[in-house]
Amino acid sequence: MMDNITNQTKLDFVENFYAKLPHKPYCSDDLGYGVIIRPKKTAILKQYIQYNPPCLITSLVFDIDRSDAFFAWSDANLPTPTWIAKNRLNGHAHVGYMLATPVCTTHRARQNVIEYLAKIEQAYSLALGADRGYTGLITKNPCHSTWENHIFDVQPHELGYLADFVDLKELKTDLKEVSGLGRNCAMFDTVRFWAYKAIRAYLSGGFDKWHSEVIEQAKNANDAFIGVSTEFGSYRAVS
């Protein structure tokens, strides 16, 4: 399939990927030095880039840290991804599925759709053997020549189509097994139920004190779920 991909298909992908980027994505050429925020016309030139805008899921990306990562989707009988960006040295890869309909994740969004997407993400992560600690903020830029990039001639995926390839009913309910968007949903529920009960105790201290305590509760919730540290930005996003 990859050998038959035309230059026009690649150009169409780059145009579509660029259009869906945040206006000012996080990006980097070396994650060891952290990430910076730049206009997307600059960020698209970096090796690593934030692919989903704030509060909107346009693509699902999975981090597979093993030498045969390229074949993980095929071995798991999953649908063809939209792209794969592979490390030329060790074979590790990011596998991306672009969504036909982006999913809003704000408090105004439909919670059942978010939970549906989270279950799909969890099921794919398990099937692919992807890294559970990957938060989904930054990806290997599939438009950058550092990586061995493979663009597949497929249309963006509907959620229902993605769900047809996995059994959502068989997912584990243990929150410690949840990662990515599912972890954010679980953290949100845990923290909001605490907040409903605790807000009265913080009314006299002002917003800043209240906000700091909510973030602290989110950190504690995350540590309880996954047992590892998450980027501070993830706490702020769900809190």
Regions found by a protein language model. Name each.
Residues 1-93, 99-115:
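Signature for HUH/AEP ssDNA processing cores
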Residues 90-96, 125-130:
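Short C-terminal domain-edge/linker segments immediately following a structured domain
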Residues 100-103, 162-239:
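Modules that initiate DNA replication and primer synthesis
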Residues 110, 114, 118, 208-212:
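Generic detection of long, well-ordered alpha-helical segments
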Residues 8, 35-40, 44-47, 114-192:
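Catalytic "initiation/cleavage/transfer" segments centered on a nucleophilic residue
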